[in-house]
A protein has these predicted regions:
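N-terminal intrinsically disordered/low-complexity leader segments
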Residues: 1-37, 230-247
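Helix-turn-helix
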Residues: 38-41, 49-83, 87
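Short alpha-helical elements of helix-turn-helix
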Residues: 40, 44, 136-139
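Hydrophobic alpha-helical connector segments
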Residues: 87, 101-134, 186-193
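Short, basic, alpha-helical segments at the C-terminal edge of helix-turn-helix-like DNA-binding modules
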Residues: 90-95
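Amphipathic alpha-helical packing segments from all-alpha helical-bundle domains
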Residues: 112, 116, 149-176, 215
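Amphipathic alpha-helical segments used for helix-helix packing
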Residues: 113, 128-151
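Amphipathic C-terminal alpha-helical segment
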Residues: 124-128, 173, 183, 193-211, ...
Length: 247
């Protein structure tokens, strides 16, 4: 083990089966963590900090301190905060994908899928009187990042489009089942759904009375989609799980 400037540097210990990072958790207590575990902890920590604060306010030192790793360990895995952010976007998608697959499962009717989406948004993205939920970390970050950081912007565009694809599929299902007033362009309407939901999520932070948001989000989606009035709230959500990120 080497020591520089009073701080123990990360050391790679190579075995026949696994590489490990060795770093201090406290001054006299040390632990071993595999390279894979270290990487995953950095991704999860970055996601948590960006969600609680914002992209510009969270630095490499903050991430390392919260994750309990050295900067040497950080830069072994990521070239910069921007590269970590891009991979955290992919990590975030892997975390919530199972939730969305369940919300939009074809086992549910199109109207149930719409109600499931509303339920998912309320549980995972909207504040409650007893729990502050800062919305979507990556949508919020997109509003804070300069236009010159193309790598980060491309990661955000890719993540957004992946989510929009679920909305597009829902529009097509509603249309095919005859629930909509008029024929529409699914791609355009799916994108509008995504934008509307995130606008409501942002506005909810200014609302001390969440009951207004609970009324506006469902009704706004039914209006935006052009669902025939006789089908409004005709079915209830069939997805009752807790979102993965809130567990």
């Amino acid at each position: 083990m080497t020591k520089t400037g009073g701080i123990y540097s990360a050391i790679f210990l190579v075995t026949q089966t696994k590489r490990y990072l060795y770093y201090p958790i406290k001054r006299t207590v040390y632990t071993y963590m595999s390279v894979t575990e270290t990487r995953e902890r950095l991704l999860a920590t970055a996601l948590e900090l960006i969600w609680q604060s914002n992209y510009n306010c969270v630095g490499v030192n903050d991430i390392c301190r919260q994750a309990g790793v050295t900067k040497g360990a950080f830069y072994h895995h990521f070239e910069s905060k921007a590269s970590l952010f891009c991979e955290a976007a992919s990590y975030y998608w892997q975390v919530i994908r199972a939730d969305l697959d369940s919300v939009f499962s074809p086992l549910h009717t199109p109207l149930q899928q719409l109600e499931n989406l509303i339920e998912f948004v309320f549980k995972s993205k909207i504040n409650t009187p007893n729990k502050r939920i800062p919305g979507c970390p990556f949508f919020n970050a997109g509003a804070q990042i300069g236009t010159d950081d193309e790598m980060v912007l491309e990661a955000l565009r890719s993540l957004s489009q992946t989510a929009i694809n679920y909305d597009i599929a829902l529009v097509r299902a509603l249309d095919s089942a005859g629930y909509l007033h008029y024929k529409t362009e699914p791609e355009s309407l799916g994108r509008m759904m995504y934008n509307y939901i995130h606008g409501v999520m942002s506005f909810s932070h200014l609302q001390p009375d969440i009951s207004t948001v609970r009324k506006d989000l469902p009704e706004g989606l039914y209006r935006l989609l052009g669902v025939k009035e006789e089908f409004w709230f005709a079915e209830s959500a069939t997805w009752q799980s807790e979102p993965t990120l809130s567990k």
